Swiss-Prot record:
One of its GO terms (molecular function) is 4 iron, 4 sulfur cluster binding. InterPro entries: APS_reductase, PAPS/APS_Rdtase, PAPS_reduct_dom, Rossmann-like_a/b/a_fold. This is Adenosine 5'-phosphosulfate reductase. Belongs to the PAPS reductase family. CysH subfamily. Keywords: Cytoplasm, Iron, Iron-sulfur, Metal-binding, Oxidoreductase. It catalyses: [thioredoxin]-disulfide + sulfite + AMP + 2 H(+) = adenosine 5'-phosphosulfate + [thioredoxin]-dithiol. Binds 1 [4Fe-4S] cluster per subunit. The active site is at residue 242. One of its GO terms (biological process) is sulfate assimilation, phosphoadenylyl sulfate reduction by phosphoadenylyl-sulfate reductase (thioredoxin). Residues 222-247 are annotated as: Disordered. It is found in: Cytoplasm.
Length: 247
């Protein structure tokens, strides 16, 4: 039976993810993105209120995933969580990626500005309760944006942190209720760098300044040499993930 992706139920999307995970076990990033396009690319009509097809998430550390996706779907939707706390270099990278790769950047923002949050929650919530800050400025806007799509593509990789060591290529994201594709999950740091060099990929200038994992400015520091690349995120706290990749 053919499933109307734009109106697919959670159970139907879960079944699609399960079949895809089996059929594309060991597939390349390009093959995974082509499957994503073939399965979800037609999307739906926004005028009907149905779900769109899929969106590609990027933290704008580099343009690798966006470059890969744009070759399969020129003008693809790219999700950027504009928390209000980003480094200027990250915002600059976002703008350059949109222009150079010709994609449609969707800026997901919290309902409250940083100033409004300071009034409601107290100044510098990130320092007192980083989990709540991430919930308000990342998780909630992400959930709202993803509710309009049937699938999302992320750039998480297994080598980035122990919490991501078993990241699947395709799964059903129970937290957000849609299919999740991680096409570069198996890539090593060397493979990433080779793709960047070979294709002259845009890279956030902060990477060359010693930031291998870039998030919000107040919660990002340079990790010690040889340590977990994500150890510079929320340094000094037990927190290691912002809640976007819990499933």
């Amino acid at each position: 039976m053919t499933v109307d992706i734009s109106r697919a139920t959670a159970d139907e999307l879960r079944s699609i993810a399960e079949r895809g995970a089996v059929e594309l076990d060991g597939a390349s990033a390009q093959e995974l993105l082509q499957w994503t396009e073939d399965t979800f690319g037609d999307g739906a009509s926004a005028a009907t209120g149905d779900r769109n097809g899929y969106i590609v998430a990027s933290n704008m550390q580099d343009g690798v995933l966006v470059h890969l996706a744009a070759q399969v779907h020129p003008g693809v939707d790219v999700l950027f969580l504009d928390t209000g706390y980003h480094f200027p270099e990250t915002i600059g990278t976002r703008d350059a990626v949109e222009q150079v790769y010709g994609v449609n950047v969707i800026n997901a923002r919290a309902l409250a500005s940083v100033a409004e949050q300071d009034v409601a929650e107290g100044k510098d919530l990130f320092a007192r309760d980083p989990n709540r800050c991430c919930a308000l400025r990342k998780v909630a806007p992400l959930k709202q944006t993803l509710s309009g799509y049937s699938a999302w593509v992320t750039g998480i990789r297994r080598v980035e942190a122990p919490t991501r060591a078993n990241a699947p290529l395709i799964s059903f994201d129970e937290a957000f209720g849609l299919v999740k594709i991680n096409p570069i999950a198996p890539w090593s740091d060397e493979e990433m760098q080779n793709y960047i060099d070979t294709n002259s990929i845009l890279v956030n200038p902060l990477v060359d300044e010693g930031y291998p994992s870039i998030g919000c400015a107040p919660c990002t520091s340079k990790p010690a040499p040889g340590s977990d690349p994500r150890s510079g995120r929320w340094a000094g706290a037990s927190k290691t993930e912002c809640g976007l990749h819990a499933s």
